[in-house]
A protein has these predicted regions:
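Positively charged n-region of N-terminal signal peptides that target proteins for export
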Residues: 1-4
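Bacterial N-terminal signal peptides
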Residues: 8-19
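Sec/Tat signal peptide C-region and signal peptidase I cleavage site
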Residues: 20-24
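N-terminal amphipathic, basic helical "cap/leader" segment at the start of enzyme domains
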Residues: 25-150
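Small-aliphatic-rich amphipathic alpha-helix that forms the alpha element of a beta-alpha
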Residues: 50, 71, 98, 152-160, ...
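Short, surface-exposed loop/helix-turn segments at secondary-structure junctions
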Residues: 130-134, 167-174
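Active-site/binding-pocket entry motifs
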Residues: 160-162, 233
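A glycine-rich helix N-cap at a beta->alpha junction
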Residues: 217-234
Length: 234
């Protein structure tokens, strides 16, 4: 009798621990350190410091895992029960996927697990910008070559399946509201960077087809914005 009870207890413990070991041993998932949600500059000061920077990026220097964790949580992390986020989302879609491009590879942020899913170990940072050409024909915006050496680029991809073909006043609002959702996330990143003294810029002009191909996106997944983060030039 005692042996059967012990056996049952051991079996129950084993079954309970399976999810833990599965997650811990999954080489394609990187658990981020818990975000530091205290401190930082006051909101009004961060707003005063918020700016777009392209020509003042310093030499490549990797962000620490803690800084990356804090930044991604600020972007669209879970900040209260029921998996509600730091960024608002039209119709509660939460349809913006945040791809993370660093020198170490390409990752997909999982806000519910606060983890990174490994997509590729290839350095694809360069495709988040337009290399060797102006951002728009005849524009004075300059090139986006900085993207290939900046320590971090975020690529915002809209999962259009989550919009469910929603219409408002007879018009499909999927793309427009997805841009609004991505804009809210990007502003969170801007404010975090302002608070932490990091340089940052958002861009809508990039090779979307190349991104979709490299990331192996489904037709329903639309790359819409990229945002590059770096240290300021000293």
């Amino acid at each position: 009798m005692k042996k059967s009870v012990v056996a049952c207890l051991m079996l129950g413990l084993f079954l309970f621990m399976i999810p833990y070991f599965s997650c811990a041993q999954d080489p394609n998932v990187i658990k981020l350190p818990p975000p530091q949600t205290d401190g930082g500059k006051p909101l009004m000061q961060a707003l005063k410091l918020r700016q777009s920077t392209r020509g003042n990026f310093g030499p490549e220097e990797k962000l620490s895992m803690q800084t990356l964790s804090n930044l991604l949580w600020a972007a669209d992390g879970v900040n209260r029960p029921n998996n509600f986020r730091t960024a608002p989302s039209a119709a509660g879609w939460h349809n913006i996927e945040i791809y993370v491009a660093t020198a170490d590879g390409l990752f997909l942020f999982d806000p519910l697990q606060h983890a990174l899913k490994v997509i590729s170990k290839e350095d694809v940072r360069a495709i988040s910008g337009l290399e060797g050409q102006a951002a728009a024909p005849g524009s004075k915006m300059g090139t986006q070559d900085f993207a290939k050496t900046a320590p971090l680029s975020l690529i915002y991809v809209a999962d259009m399946t989550k919009t469910k073909g929603m219409k408002y006043q007879g018009e499909d609002v999927g793309i427009a509201w997805s841009y609004a959702n991505a804009g809210a996330i990007s502003e969170n990143v801007y404010l975090f960077c302002a608070s932490e003294g990091l340089a940052c810029i958002i861009r809508a002009m990039f090779d979307q087809a190349k991104v979709a191909s490299t990331f192996k996106l489904r037709p329903e997944e639309k790359p819409i914005l990229t945002q590059t983060i770096a240290q300021f030039k000293k």
